[in-house]
Amino acid sequence: MVLEVKNLSFKYSQKLILDKLSFSVPKNSITSILAPNGSGKTTLLKCLLGLLKPLEETEIKACNKDILPLKPYEKAKLIAYIPQVEYYAFNFSVLDFVLMGKATHLNLFAMPKAKHIKEATSVLERLDLESLKDQGINDLSGGQRQMVLLARSLLQRTPLLLLDEPTSALDLKNQALFFDAIKDEMKKRELSVLVNIHDPNLVARHSTHVVMLKDKKLFLQASTPIAMTSHNLSALYDTPLEAIWHDDKLVVYAL
């Protein structure tokens, strides 16, 4: 397993948000987190990254390393993260922003070399972003920024990638391009993905495994075909839903 989580609990003040979650992310997989709104999906990702501190009984291992005591630069060698669309304090050019993905591969204060710039440019070309490389990151649309964040994460070359609602600002074309780029990368090297998505249809289309959360706890973890059924989805969302599989594609609608 690339990621193993045991007894993850988290409180805001005295309010319990996550209660003893235990789940894992297999190698070379895309595991989606699916849950009703307000279930702590983003909080979970921030706990995994160390941006929020879970309760003491929590155990989190990435690539068999206990990541809670690791320093930020050590975590950055294991985990890349794409948050929901953000505005940045400094308006870096797209190329410079993507090159930050190489920071953990360079010595302190070292400048990127020609080979790093070539690699960054190649990733931008793959994502149809080369024409934007000289623009400021804050001058882009939300969807364009998400694609640039993906480029930076791919350049980081970590074994684990965490995504928080990565397609919320993307049109249908770029949603497909986004996940196609990740799947292409998975064919080249070992890469596992944990992604927070709210759309069950996207989960079914792109995920190999699903983690469902409900009432602060783990509701279900299973492979996608087993997890994404009418029974499970109706129970998860407390509303009657029909899930129909056809040619390995899922359509979910309310009854």
Curated annotation (Swiss-Prot):
Compartment(s) of residence: Cell inner membrane
Keyword field contains Magnesium: no
Keywords attached to this entry: ATP-binding, Cell inner membrane, Cell membrane, Ion transport, Iron, Iron transport, Membrane, Nucleotide-binding, Transport
Disulphide bridges: none
A GO CC term assigned to this protein in UniProt: plasma membrane
Membrane topology: Peripheral membrane protein
Main localization, broad class: membrane
Positions annotated to bind ATP: A35, P36, N37, G38, S39, G40, K41, T42
GO MF term set: ATP binding; ATP hydrolysis activity
InterPro entries tied to this protein: AAA+_ATPase, ABC_transporter-like_ATP-bd, ABC_transporter-like_CS, Metal_Ion_Import_ABC, P-loop_NTPase
Example GO biological process: iron ion transport
SUPFAM superfamilies associated with the record: P-loop containing nucleoside triphosphate hydrolases (SSF52540)
PROSITE patterns xref list: ABC_TRANSPORTER_1, ABC_TRANSPORTER_2
Domain ABC transporter residues, every copy: 3-240
Record-linked Gene3D superfamilies: P-loop containing nucleotide triphosphate hydrolases
Function: Part of a binding-protein-dependent transport system for an iron chelatin. Probably responsible for energy coupling to the transport system (Potential).
Family designation: Belongs to the ABC transporter superfamily.
Protein name per the record: Probable iron chelatin transport ATP-binding protein jhp_0821
